[in-house]
Amino acid sequence: MTSDPLTGTPAATPASPAPLPSLRLVDVACRRGDRILFSGLNETLERGQLLWLRGGNGRGKTSLLRLVAGLAAPERGQILWDGVPTRGNEHFDRALVYIAHANALKDDLTATESLAFLARVHGRDAGAPALRAALARLGLAGRERTPVRSLSQGLRRRVALARLALETGPSLGVLDEPFDALDVAGTATLHALLAAHRARGGSVLLTSHHLHLDGAAAGAGFRVLDLDLLPRDGGTAP
């Protein structure tokens, strides 16, 4: 133990930083209608990691994202954030950034107004400077006042993805097909955004049918979860 050089009293030991919370899925099963899409899912997503969900059509990729986002409940199992169930968990709600496959933009609003609306709906109150900066990071500088109806599908996707650029802390990005409709430049921009998000301790759970993701592009902490390898009904995988 060290001591204060002036008083000779023992110096306080610096407290270790609290570990950043992680997402845990414990024996999760997902039902849609009368079918079990998958069961027996046990997975942990640590801060700074990116987990890419893969699987054939109808295997439950989007359904799993909806379970994590709290839009549906698992048939069995638990979804935990820092060891606490995510349902009704205010800490998790504040950390979650869910961007669905549909952009959920209103044609009559401008890009800035749309981003502000999306932020408010999800509990974020972003000021004008933050909105401008987020849109600029997605390559939308100069289009802030452009009505959504005048934007291409790729640019609309960038507006929706700018929600992640508003984040300043280690949040959880849950993204359904984020690369859809993006051109080469937009794809590179999204890769940079994901890297910056993870560098500050954020984590990412996403689906993508596009071959834009690999270990080299995503860097350390990149993992793949193949839902095709999970059993549908608690038995063996197909």
Segments from the language model and where they lie:
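Conserved structural motif at the start of ABC-family nucleotide-binding domains
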Residues: 23, 37-40
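ABC ATPase nucleotide-binding domain "signature" region
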Residues: 52, 156-165
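Q-loop/switch helix immediately C-terminal to the Walker
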Residues: 102, 107-123, 130
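Conserved ABC transporter NBD signature motif
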Residues: 74-92
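Catalytic Walker B motif of ABC-type/P-loop ATPase nucleotide-binding domains
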Residues: 173-177
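The feature captures the beta-strand-to-loop junction immediately N-terminal to the Walker
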Residues: 54-56
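Helix-to-loop junction immediately C-terminal to a conserved catalytic motif
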Residues: 69
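Conserved ABC ATPase "signature" region
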Residues: 116, 128-143, 162
